[in-house]
């Protein structure tokens, strides 16, 4: 994977080969307000997703880092002002100290919002995991990624896909030598349904808890190439300590 990662980190989800775009494949348009923890990271344009974990902090992928970020919450159609959005600038952006941009190990970052958001039916936090999700756990992945394998069709409406956590042995067999203990695979070995990464930094929520962060993958919904996600259960202490210190 290392050589391929030279092509990565362009703000959208990391997906290889380059002729396969980031997108949700085999998914559906999320019901409005059904993913109230989903945020859009904006720098004059939508470039990544993230997850609201309390009224002033967002979790995303470290490879989504920019010096300044506006966090957009309460979004469904990201190209229309629907009246329920909250736009808040970042006050602090903190990447994991052991993030490796070459291997994408520890691909996680925290964003402190300049002011707390108002929590309501459209904007709500998602709990951190109380334990790691076992293989077979069903999860919801969401994002505004491109919907075409070739070409560009960025959806206005938030897209969702349902997929299971895969056994770690299957994950490692799909990407020999590239999977660390801080990564999980979610999807289908037969292909056909995949976030492909949807949008980098976006959520993987299983049984109501944030278990994954969209990180990288090879192609889109390809057989034996499931999506790879940051394993959030390994970072609960780091998240809580970082929030307490900032």
From Swiss-Prot:
Question: Which processes are annotated in GO (biological process)?
Answer: collagen catabolic process; digestion; proteolysis; response to acetaldehyde; response to caffeine; response to nicotine; response to nutrient
**Do the record's keywords include Protease?**
yes
Name the residues of the propeptide. 16-23
Tell me which EC number(s) this protein carries.
3.4.21.4
Keyword flag Electron transport: no
Q: Which reaction does it catalyse?
A: Preferential cleavage: Arg-|-Xaa, Lys-|-Xaa
What are the annotated disulfide bridges?
30-160, 48-64, 132-233, 139-206, 171-185, 196-220
The entry sums up its family as follows: Belongs to the peptidase S1 family.
Any idea what this protein is called? Anionic trypsin-2
Gene name of the record: Prss2
């Amino acid at each position: 994977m290392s050589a391929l990662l030279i092509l990565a980190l362009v703000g959208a989800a990391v997906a290889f080969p380059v002729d396969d775009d980031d997108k949700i494949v085999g998914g559906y348009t999320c019901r409005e307000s059904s993913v109230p923890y989903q945020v859009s990271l904006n720098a004059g344009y939508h470039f990544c997703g993230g997850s609201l974990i309390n009224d002033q902090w967002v979790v995303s992928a470290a490879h989504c880092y920019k010096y300044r970020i506006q966090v957009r919450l309460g979004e469904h159609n990201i190209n229309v002002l629907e009246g329920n959005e909250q736009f808040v600038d970042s006050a602090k952006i903190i990447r994991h100290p052991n993030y490796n941009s070459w291997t994408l190990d520890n691909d996680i970052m925290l964003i402190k919002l300049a002011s707390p958001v108002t929590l309501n039916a459209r904007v709500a936090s998602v709990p951190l995991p109380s334990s790691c999700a076992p293989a077979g756990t069903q999860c919801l992945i969401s994002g505004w990624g491109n919907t075409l394998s070739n070409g560009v069709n960025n959806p206005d409406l938030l897209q969702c896909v349902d997929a299971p956590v895969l056994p770690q042995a299957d994950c490692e067999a799909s990407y020999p030598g590239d999977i660390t203990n801080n990564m999980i695979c979610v999807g289908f070995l037969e292909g056909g349904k995949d976030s492909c990464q949807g949008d980098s930094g976006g959520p993987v929520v299983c049984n109501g808890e944030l278990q994954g962060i969209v990180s990288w993958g090879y192609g889109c919904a390809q057989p034996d190439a499931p999506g790879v996600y940051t394993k959030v259960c390994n970072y609960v202490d780091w998240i809580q300590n970082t929030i307490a210190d900032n």
